[in-house]
């Protein structure tokens, strides 16, 4: 059977690299949607490494200028696809809260949505794909196309993380194993908690994340080269790509200067103010903060993006003899930390202690009575240390009897009481891990992403950069073994879904 496959091409190039090996491994027609900047676009227009039957350049089809949205069309679209457009749009980091360069109007946002929807409908109607290969859906327009594929029963092949260390899986839904429906029938391997914790320790990604953060931004030479290239460029992307609207050279330089100042001030505040020593023998609930402006919050938990408000709700819901220990996420450094006003707001909440990002998460989990998380890995890690957890998003491990998902904030107080009295059983966790072992594979996504940033984007300092086939060939050779492994995992899922 000849498969029709649409591939989402972005600046990390992972899906493009997989496509290179995939085209020679199965009988398929490859199509692509390229979401790229102006300087990357010529590479995809002229490349000869992957035989794409057709490539649509997303940004070429989208303009927010002087457009009046067709509300009737969008209204009908929502009914057909059962997609809440405003829920996606209001959580788009480019549209609201996190954009320092351009304030999008209602008409601009809805015009972008209308053009995106029409383009995606056109592509799906023309190709009628069997599969869609994508990265995790970090931006709303990719999430939109992803949801449209699910509605049309197109199988999605998404590289994502199973919330367990240096590993990955290719699944239809983000952070949810495809075999999750088999949980009840999956047999435990009879591993006790000590054996399960040994399994976890072998996978732990703490060092990998720290290395990624250390490499973030590259070398001083990378920063200087990126600045020089940017200042000498025509900066055409600022006019053609809506995520870059308002990013004039002067405003970018100003913003970078202010960011560097804020970064130093905030880091100093974090080091001086956030707690590094606490009494772990007291009764406490542990809440690890998620990184703001990330998928985990904006798409994974769209109704729970205000973490400070969540902290207030938790404190209001605690039994009288409990405290809330909150830990800052080390990854927040990549976003220049939080504002001093946000830190003041958090630390002013009574019965709450804000921990320094260097404090051991494992110690906090081990000594807590309950872990509450928006939807990251901490809720799953809690089970390894015999602790119940509460989450706010749909995620694979919520099948565990010791994991409780909040879908109505009014239920939080009662859910906390129930969770605190819930015992964690090793056989429940072992069944879930046994299920995961059938899907996950070894893959350090942080290291791979860092390598691509170093090799293509000057350490991540310049994403609107010129790319050559010579660079891509070098990456294909250097990472051949890893990329073939990723390709094989995609083929496994293609074969699996084809038999259904």
Regions found by a protein language model. Give the residues of each.
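Nucleotide-activated donor-dependent transferases that construct or modify glycoconjugates
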Residues: 1-12, 35-36, 105, 133, ...
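Histidine-anchored nucleotide/phosphate-binding helix
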Residues: 8-25, 303-318
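A donor-sugar binding/catalytic signature common to diverse glycosyltransferases
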Residues: 12, 134-135, 160, 356-404
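Conserved N-terminal ligand/cofactor-binding loop architecture of enzyme catalytic domains
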Residues: 21-120, 164-267, 488-499
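Conserved nucleotide-sugar donor-interacting segment of glycosyltransferase catalytic cores
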Residues: 118-182
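C-terminal amphipathic helix plus adjacent low-complexity
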Residues: 190-247, 268-274, 409-500
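Active-site donor-nucleotide binding/catalytic segment of nucleotide-sugar enzymes
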Residues: 279-315, 322, 328-332
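Catalytic donor nucleotide-activated moiety binding site of glycosyltransferases and closely related
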Residues: 312-356
């Amino acid at each position: 059977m000849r498969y029709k496959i649409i591939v989402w091409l972005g600046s990390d190039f992972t899906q493009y690299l997989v496509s290179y090996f995939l085209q020679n491994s199965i009988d398929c027609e490859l199509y692509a949607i390229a979401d790229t900047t102006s300087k990357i676009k010529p590479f995809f227009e002229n490349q000869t490494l992957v035989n794409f039957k057709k490539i649509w350049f997303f940004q070429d089809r989208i303009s927010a200028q002087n457009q009046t949205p067709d509300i009737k069309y969008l209204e009908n679209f929502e009914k057909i696809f059962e997609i809440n457009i405003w829920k996606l749009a209001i959580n788009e980091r480019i549209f609201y809260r996190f954009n320092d360069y351009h304030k999008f109007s209602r008409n601009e946002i809805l015009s972008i949505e209308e053009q995106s929807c029409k383009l995606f409908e056109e592509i799906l109607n023309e190709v009628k794909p069997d599969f869609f290969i994508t990265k995790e859906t970090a931006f709303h327009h990719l999430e939109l196309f992803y949801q449209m594929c699910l509605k049309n029963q197109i199988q999605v092949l998404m590289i994502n993380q199973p919330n367990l260390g240096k590993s990955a899986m290719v699944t239809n839904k983000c952070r949810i194993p495809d075999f999750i429906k088999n949980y009840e029938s999956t047999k435990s391997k009879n591993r006790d908690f000590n054996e399960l914790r040994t399994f976890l320790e072998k996978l732990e990604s703490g060092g990998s994340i720290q290395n990624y953060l250390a490499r973030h931004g590259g070398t001083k030479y990378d920063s200087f080269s990126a600045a020089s290239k940017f200042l000498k460029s025509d900066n055409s992307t600022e006019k053609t790509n809506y995520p870059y609207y308002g990013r004039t050279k002067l405003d970018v330089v100003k913003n970078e200067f202010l960011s560097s100042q804020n970064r130093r001030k905030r880091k100093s505040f974090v080091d001086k103010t956030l707690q590094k020593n606490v009494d772990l023998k007291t009764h406490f609930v542990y809440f690890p903060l998620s990184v703001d402006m990330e998928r985990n919050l904006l798409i994974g938990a769209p109704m729970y993006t205000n973490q400070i408000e969540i902290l207030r709700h938790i404190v209001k819901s605690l039994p009288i003899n409990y405290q809330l220990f909150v830990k800052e996420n080390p990854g927040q450094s990549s976003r220049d930390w939080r504002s001093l006003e946000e830190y003041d707001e958090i630390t002013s909440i009574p019965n709450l202690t804000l921990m320094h990002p260097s404090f051991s998460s494992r110690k906090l989990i081990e000594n807590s009575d309950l872990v509450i998380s928006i939807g990251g890995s901490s809720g799953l890690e809690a089970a390894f240390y015999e602790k119940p957890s509460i989450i706010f998003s749909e995620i694979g491990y919520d099948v565990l009897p010791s994991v409780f998902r909040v879908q109505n904030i009014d239920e939080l107080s009662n859910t906390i009481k129930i969770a605190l009295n819930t015992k964690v059983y090793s056989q429940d966790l072992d069944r879930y891990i046994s299920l995961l072992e059938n899907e996950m594979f070894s893959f350090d996504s942080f290291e791979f992403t860092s390598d691509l940033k170093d090799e293509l984007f000057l350490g991540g300092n310049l994403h609107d950069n010129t790319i050559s086939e010579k660079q891509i060939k070098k990456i294909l050779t250097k990472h051949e073994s890893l990329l073939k492994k990723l390709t094989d995992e995609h083929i496994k899922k293609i074969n699996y879904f084809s038999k259904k």
